[in-house]
Amino acid sequence: EVHIVTKDDLELIYGGLDKLKSISVGQVSASENLQARIDIDHFVNRHCAILGSTGSGKSNTVSIILEAIATRKDKDNYDIKSTRILLIDPHGEYGGILKEYSQIFKVNADTSKLEKELLIPYWALPFQEFIKSFPGKISEKQEEYIREEVLQRKIKSSKYLTVIPSETAITADSPIPFSINQLWFDLDDFERQTFKERGQPETKTLNTSSQGNPNALKSNKYTPAGNGGASPFMNNSAQGILGFLTLMRNRLLDQRFKFLYELGNLKPDLEGKITGDLDALIEDWIGTEKPITILDLSSVPSEIMG
């Protein structure tokens, strides 16, 4: 026996979801009058992937789902103000599609379009991500040396935090402000030192008339090491990272990376003190009047987008 499937039959198969607890993302192809709905709790509390070949409409599908979530109504047909969606947009695809419902944070923001500048504090990155933000290769031993230097600076500047953590709880991954200028300057200075007496740091040959400046990323100058074992003597404890530090300095001066290193009130002074903090940054990201916050990474330099 063959029966025609009715709308009521399709409702039993595809329907049954509470409208207040679900979102509509279109119509079921078998019946244009039947909404395709997704249980919102099941959807957002689980990992979800939208897959398809190039040009199949993945971005459009994501936009439809996000718009449906952003425009949900409560039982009295009012907007649900607590909706908060954080969208990481590597290719700048969603700002135009979702502009009515979103606040965009972008590198080199266009304020005429009400975009806000995207800032990502270097000191809040895990150490591995921090060190990978600079070009050049270093050995595992050299990396551990820099990790320890970062750790010590975070421990030192933690005293400026509102709630001071114990030293044992702090790691190089802890999101504690420290001065990247001072880190570079100290590492660079140690590599360049020469001594009048072999192995005697107190006999450094620092040129006092041409001292460096960490804020300007200007190195200290020392008398070059002598030839044939003559004074001045090289610093035998140097780690051999001067080439890496030169590349690091170039990256810090590169204005394309100001979103990472030039941070306004989130950039620490040489002691590690800041006037802003992460709580204000996060509040700025998710405390907007719009339900969707888009972090547009399309202008982030490709060198660090791997």
Predicted regions and their residues:
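Glycine- and other small-residue-rich loops at beta-strand/loop junctions that grip anionic moieties
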Residues: 39, 119, 298
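Conserved P-loop NTPase catalytic core
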Residues: 109-116, 130
